[in-house]
Amino acid sequence: MTRESAVATKRNWAILAAGVGLVYVLVRHRHRLLCPLRRVWSFGSLVPQRRIEVINSVQDPTTQWVLNELKNHCQTFKVLGFDCEWITVGGSRRPVALLQLSSHRGLCALFRLCHMKQIPQDLRELLEDDSVIKVGVAPQEDAMKLSHDYGVGVASTLDLRFLCVMAGHKPEGLGKLSKTHLNYTLDKHWRLACSNWEAKTLEPKQLDYAANDALMAVAIYQKLCRDLQPKHFWQRRQLDDNSMHNKFEPFLDVDFTKGFTLNPSGSGVTRSKGSTQSKSNKWVPKKQPYRQIATRTKDFYDNCLLQAPDGELLCTIDRRKASWYLNQNLGTHISEEPFTVRLNFEPAGRAVGDVGRFYQTIKKNQCVVCGDRDAYIRKNVVPREYRKHFPLVMKSHTSDDVLLLCPTCHQLSNISDLRVRSKLAVQCEAPFKQEDGSVKYHDDPQLKRVQSAGKALLHHGAKIPAAKKAEMEKTLLDYYSDQTDITEDLLRQAASVEYRVENSDYCQHGERVVQQYRDHFGGLVELERLWRQHFLHTMQPRFLPELWNVNHNADRLEVRASEGRIDKADLMVAGLDAKIKET
């Protein structure tokens, strides 16, 4: 080999090595390199297409054209950016002045409701169409304002912060979301946000502000959806609209702020799927209205074996329960691995059919949704607020109702449960959360004033100004109409008045729902089936225990009934008495 050819060979190898190194760097850091480009593309691609249409009147020919365009755009992508603007006068909110709707193709329709005598029928239909998702930050609040001010319902609102949590991102306001995910800075100056939206003509800056809010919501939705659809970095594909809608269905029309906390354990969960944020960057609200839930890293299932006297496998149990049988001389230790106990007495029942085989199977210590094994929390598929009101036969031996979820999946599951609770509240007339019927006691304003006046006059009468003192004395004499003078006995009586009175409309949500299903909606197995089906539909678990099924408890009760181990009254409560008679 000549010197020249040797040099050329070395140069070629060097170029090849450099090329391989460059490819490695690009592949290794592809997300860091491509994410800024994708952010710019996500919103930048919509900017040239942006068309702002201002609608001032129902009679305006543009009105129907804009509505037809929005509907056509929703045929291919059933999502609209949604926002509202209004003004406040003297501390009171005026009716919504401006409604903003934006499609994924950049059409931004600004409906000036303050100048329109009525809302067009086609606009009502679009807002009430539950197949079209209206996205934004806190869109439920805007929907409530529209309903209050104009009597129009807005169906299928979706808070973008739910998507942030699902994708492992920090849930923020629209301005910060646009900067974080699209690298676009929205003008959120307070003077612009609080400008006169009822003006005869809106300024160009107002039009940009209003249109960009709605358009940005659609762009952020698209970006977060792509984060939730894993793919190779070289792939570019259309969003699967149907699968996304199914995934988000549990969060439609749900208020993001109702008891939400990204870190439910408060116990230092160190990671969040889909995110590389450090623990210190996790978002936790200042107020946490719910008790904190502890995660566990120790195995939940010990998978010890319990046998009948003849050696037949009955079920798997935890180590503590197995040790209890031994300590009570109710069983004999058979083997150490797996830890096996054989009973010294004949059990009430044996493993029968798939119901029995479910209890015999080995359970894995992992999240049933995603398979994570690092940390998990027990999830009651039928929430305890309902299960605790079930008859004993439907509360005991229901280990199938307890599943393991990782902290992130547990949080998402709890959020999705809010939708079912709200539906049950309406169906069963069982107030939920802060509605009037959920408060057991309320304050009687008159009695509260009487008690306050009595205490003040009794303990601080000499320090109270004459005018205020006279007002308090009048309050007492108006209430105690049979008295003419303020005496110490009267003051003591007033100071001890109980102003908290029982709410005659009070009902406990869980108890009322259980009662209604027991008496009117097919029995408690139907309520169980509702919750278990909801869990399957919303969480789509991929690692459920073998033989787990929606009707497990109903099948278990039927087995017990066939063995004569359940009362007829319990069957009626469960809703199985008619079915048992048929068989």
Swiss-Prot record:
Quaternary structure note: Homodimer.
Binding site for a divalent metal cation 1: D83, E85, D213
Residue ranges occupied by any 3'-5' exonuclease domain in the UniProt entry: 62-228
Reported phenotype of the disruption mutant: Developmental delays and premature female germline stem cell attrition, reduced fecundity, associated with a dramatic extension of lifespan that is reversed with an antioxidant diet.
EC number: 3.1.13.-
Lineage: Eukaryota, Metazoa, Ecdysozoa, Arthropoda, Hexapoda
Membrane-spanning parts: 12-29
Cofactor(s) required, per the database record: Mg(2+); Mn(2+)
Binding residues for a divalent metal cation 2: D83
Residue numbers on the Mitochondrial intermembrane membrane side: 1-11
Protein name, UniProt field: Exonuclease 3'-5' domain-containing protein 2
Disulfide bonds: none
